[in-house]
Amino acid sequence: MGAGVGVAGCTRGHRNWVPSQLPPREIKAGVSLAVVTEFAWVLAPRPKRATASALGTESPRFLDRPDFFDYPDSDQARLLAVAQFIGEKPIVFINSGSSPGLFHHILVGLLVVAFFFLLFQFCTHINFQKGA
C-alpha cells in the first residue's frame, strides 16, 4: 500500500479516510441537519399547548357555524354581504334566456365525427396480412 493512502484505492482526498466514516464536510452537514431537525421538533406545537392556548381565546360565533360560507349562489343577500365585507364590487350574473342545446349538439356531433375519422384512419393504415 502506498504512503498517504489509508485504504487501497481510496481517492476521497482524505489521508486516513475509511469507507464507513463520513468526510469532514459531510459530517458538518449531518450535524447541522440533526440540529435543524431537533430545533424543528422543539418548535412544533404540542396538543397540550394547543388546547391551553385555545382555552383563553374565543373565535367569533359565525366562524364556528358549519354553514359558514356554505350557501347557494342564488342567495343574493349573502353574496352582497360577503362582497361588501371583502371590499369588492359584486358581480351579478343574469340568465340570458338562450339554451345551451345548440352548442351541446354541435359539440357532440364534432366528437362523433372525430371518432369516426380516427377509426377510418386506423382501419386504412392497419395491415391484415399474415406475418407482417
UniProtKB/Swiss-Prot annotation:
The keyword Transmembrane applies. The chain crosses the membrane at residues 100-120. Its main location: membrane. It comes from the Eukaryota. It is a single-pass type I membrane protein. It is found in: Cell membrane. Keywords: Cell membrane, Fertilization, Membrane, Transmembrane, Transmembrane helix. It holds the Pfam family FIMP. GO terms for cellular component: plasma membrane. InterPro entries: FIMP. The keyword DNA-binding does not apply. Testis-specific. GO terms for biological process: fertilization; fusion of sperm to egg plasma membrane involved in single fertilization. May play a role in sperm-oocyte fusion during fertilization. This is Fertilization-influencing membrane protein. The lineage of its organism: Eukaryota, Metazoa, Chordata, Craniata, Vertebrata.
